[in-house]
Swiss-Prot record:
The gene is mhpF. It catalyses: acetaldehyde + NAD(+) + CoA = acetyl-CoA + NADH + H(+). It comes from the Bacteria. Signal peptide: none annotated. This is Acetaldehyde dehydrogenase 1. It comes from Cupriavidus necator (strain ATCC 17699 / DSM 428 / KCTC 22496 / NCIMB 10442 / H16 / Stanier 337). It is an enzyme of class 1 (oxidoreductase). The active site is at C134 (acyl-thioester intermediate). Its EC number is 1.2.1.10. Belongs to the acetaldehyde dehydrogenase family. One of its GO terms (molecular function) is acetaldehyde dehydrogenase (acetylating) activity.
Amino acid sequence: MDMKASGHHKVAIIGSGNIGTDLMIKVMRHGRSLEMGAMVGIDAASDGLARAARLGVPTTAEGIDGLVGMPGFGDIRIAFDATSAGAHAHHNRVLQQHGVRVIDLTPASIGPYVVPVVNLDQHLDAPNINMVTCGGQATIPMVAAVSRVARVHYAEIVASISSRSAGPGTRANIDEFTETTSQALCSVGGAARGKAIIVLNPAEPPLMMRDTVFTLSEDGDEAEIAASVEAMAQAVQGYVPGYRLKQRVQFERIAASAPLNIPGLGPMSGLKTSIFLEVEGAAHYLPAYAGNLDIMTSAALACAERLAETRLSA
């Protein structure tokens, strides 16, 4: 894997763990407009930094200060932050001072929530964009698919991921995961209310990421909603090939005489839509069952490519 020729926009990845390392390999293998400029960590013995060095990527184990002090820092146009919500605020402050675009893979939520197939084009000029969460990247497109056909009163998602794919960063950010995903189900997905649940599944051998999406919407045309969901799934497959519907979309009409009680909204009737997803990872660095991590890195790469092609080239 040789570095891309000059003319590509240089990027830095902050965080040399699973997500950062997988993202690095994606940039090097599949980056159309991007080139690795730096891999940044805080553990000199991490596998991610060692792998980056072997691949010829400049590295530092001195964190954000080490990045700023690197000889090639002035060439960095985009930085991906794959650390933690707590660390991101400081990283963002430093990077903004130097005019570097930031793609945030933590649940820090400093910039607008972005899901590539839903709202990326609205936020191409934002200095910082937030990739929501793995569960958000998988499920928000489905809520948006229902929402563009029928007004969604409530959306609830359950993201089930293998315990093995949940590293220390994921585990430390569980509360942020649920809050961030719930908010983005509304602000990006279009639901009036949203709820997110994450399940760490300890099964061996590890299971692939599975997501269940429930929406309660105003009455709508079932065939139109199903077609919208299928079209959206195909759009996500454009950058996450392992994303798929596990079965046909299911519908249930909730009568006004037997309404569902929705927290914050009260008794509601309408059309309940149930969508079942599976996300298989591309296995660039992470195992195929870690689709939850793969969808984050794939979405971040898609955003960076679009930024590079539409904003940085201008």
